[in-house]
Amino acid sequence: MKILVTGSAGRVGSFVARQLLGEGHRVRGFDLKPSGINSPEFDEVVGDFDDAAAAQRASNGVDAVLHLGAFMSWLPADRDRLYRANVDGTRIVLEAAAAAKVGRFVFASSGEVYPENKPEFQPVTEDHPARPLSPYGVTKLLGEELVKFQGRVSPMETVILRFSHTQNASELLDPTSFFSGPRFFLHPKIRQQEGFGNALAVEKLKALDIGEEALVLTRNENGRPFRMHITDTRDMAKGILLALTHAKAVGGIFNLGATEPVDFADILPAMAKKTGLPLVAVDLPGAGVWYHTSNARIRETLGFEPEWPITRMLDEAVSAWTRRQT
């Protein structure tokens, strides 16, 4: 097959593109910047998803589309860009794919459509009401509706995957990581909360600053440690490829992520023990993050089996962290 991978310069898209090439497929990338992938079986279109001409060039001659690219932000200043990339862009890529008579279109949505961090019940299944509370979540839900519409009015097969939070294992202990830095490390978390304008959180965090980098165990205002899903990129790629090829995926909506959530009360002490970094704990205002999302449907329907639980990811993260210290 020849497969279009949007977001081919990103974490998941670049990994999936390389994996497809390794399996003997031809791949076309489509992203705002070059992917850096070098293969005779790879070509790419550099441009915006909402550029109809670029989307058509990207879609022509491919058998399937993995629409993994998106713009992610929670900043009010980015809302116009969010809607252009994630709603207009998805519509335009869908229409280009349908015009090119693409066989299957796989769309990367998000747990933000529920949203996972404020669930009405747990574990969160695909039947949970979709009532997003962030502009990003709204754009992904609108994208889902566009995909379902195209599936109704054209012969193109469609699949929707609601992504878990995704990371490379090597990022877990990297304080410069966009996600893991402020999630697990004190100084990046202080900078994040300053950017959000959360003065009370900043005050509490700065009171813990010992002058050197430390890990931080975040709890809610009642002392409950955070809990969330963190899924390895390799497991996400495995689920994406099942959505691309499995007959039972057609027309489906699937949560894609790790089977078990990560309890910060367990993982942070383990990180501290394996690295020797100091560990501090903080209770921040609000209910905090505490959720469990079910992946039962994709396991039972498509045979998805994650292979990289957080403990295995952490072992790899420690190796990467050790290399950075030398």
Located regions from the model:
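N-terminal Rossmann NAD(P)H-binding glycine-rich loop of SDR-like oxidoreductase domains
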Residues: 3-23
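NAD(P)H-binding glycine-rich loop region in Rossmannoid oxidoreductase-like domains
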Residues: 36, 47-85
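NAD(P)-cofactor binding segment of oxidoreductase domains
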Residues: 65, 77-105
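Amphipathic terminal alpha-helices
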Residues: 310-326
